[in-house]
Amino acid sequence: MRLRTRKASQQSNQIQTQRTARAKRKYSEVDDSLPSGGEKPSKNETGLLSSIKKFIKGSTPKEERENPSKRSRIERDIDNNLITSTPRAGEKPNKQISRVRRKSQVNGEAGSYEMTNQHVKQNGKLEDNPSSGSPPRTTLLGTIFSPVFNFFSPANKNGTSGSDSPGQAVEAEEIVKQLDMEQVDEITTSTTTSTNGAAYSNQAVQVRPSLNNGLEEAEETVNRDIPPLTAPVTPDSGYSSAHAEATYEEDWEVFDPYYFIKHVPPLTEEQLNRKPALPLKTRSTPEFSLVLDLDETLVHCSLNELEDAALTFPVLFQDVIYQVYVRLRPFFREFLERMSQMYEIILFTASKKVYADKLLNILDPKKQLVRHRLFREHCVCVQGNYIKDLNILGRDLSKTIIIDNSPQAFAYQLSNGIPIESWFMDKNDNELLKLIPFLEKLVELNEDVRPHIRDRFRLHDLLPPD
């Protein structure tokens, strides 16, 4: 009997202990399962089943899924609010552009493209912007002023030429803008106008700046302007020795205008059949036509204030007014006054009409010097480069001459082109005066001007061999 009594008491104690433990566990589970956001508690989810469900589902993974989504939204907001002056394409810059960017960092001249398209790490290094879906943005200088020339490499030399349609022009600007201004600042040129064919001595030619890159001249060590692509620059143009050393230390491809000319694709039938942009000549129109470039050929303009600017005027672009400062090349007016007496002067620029037309209205309000004006929309867009096809003039090419600081500009009529050194601020420059005797002689001869231009400047000798 004692044994039975003892077993009964032990069994009752065990049952009571189990009930107490179950009550504690159930109470704890109810507290843990209480919803924090006002949700209804799940029914009958206690004990081992509830613990298993908690272990499988849990709340931590849900929080981890929410946090990354929140971080990505913040990142997108930052990217959308980031104001940049250059297009941000999804593709990485090509080899040449990346090298130029490194040189800018070496010289401590990180341009707007670098600063806006890369994030700064805590260690001060730059990394690519993770956002690649932002719409392309264009610069003021790249849309109003003359664009830079794009690298023309063997990889794309067989490409087809574009047209001057609005859609292709926009696409071309997106390509051109990837080079942007810090690239132009790194490239030097050596094109000359000598008669012995030394117009391209060291094959380091600049890729033409958007007219007035908005920086100060190359001759100034502080706030200097970006020299124009393909435009000649004198050895004492103000570049420091450290700058030159950094340039030559890197193994990168420079823009070769004569390689570009050699491999430029032929004009399409549509381009060859474009209607002439100029009206027919009148009886008072001179027999010979002289086509002149604007930027770095006749004038030099900048968005930075120039103390010695000959004039300044505002330009309204995208609801923003920009002040343009203009320097006139020495003997600018004398050259035009003299040449306008024997030539039909035609201004042909790759700049936007909103800028160039306003400048010409100031310089020649009555059109006594320049009879006709052509702008970017009259150029032919070839793989991001604007070329001035003289066929659009509707003039006899045997009596047509073009003067430009960029040989690429007259790539389709090389025998009609006279290269001239780019001008920024040299007050002793007399390149325009030096051309007057030769131009007068061409009119006096009254012959096809192309053989004479070819023999004088020998640009065809600078083309690379086949």
Swiss-Prot record:
Location of region: Disordered: 1-140, 220-240
A GO molecular-function annotation: RNA polymerase II CTD heptapeptide repeat phosphatase activity
Residues annotated with Phosphoserine modification: S28, S51, S85, S104, S134, S165
Domain FCP1 homology stretches: 283-442
Composition bias, Basic and acidic residues: 60-79
GO biological process, one term: negative regulation of BMP signaling pathway
Pfam family of the protein (one): NIF
PROSITE patterns per UniProt: FCP1
GO cellular component terms listed in the entry, alphabetical order: nucleoplasm
InterPro entries: Dullard_phosphatase, FCP1_dom, HAD-like_sf, HAD_sf, TIM50
Keyword hit for NAD: no
Keyword NAD: no
Comp. bias regions, Polar residues: 8-20, 129-140
Coiled-coil regions listed: none
Keywords: Acetylation, Hydrolase, Phosphoprotein, Protein phosphatase
CDD domains in UniProt: HAD_FCP1-like (cd07521)
Modified residues (N6-acetyllysine): K26, K57
Enzyme Commission (EC) number: 3.1.3.-
Modification Phosphothreonine, positions: T86
Family: Belongs to the CTDSPL2 family.
Entry function: Probable phosphatase.
UniProt cross-references to PANTHER family, sorted A to Z: DULLARD PROTEIN PHOSPHATASE
Name recorded for this polypeptide: CTD small phosphatase-like protein 2
Source organism per UniProt: Homo sapiens
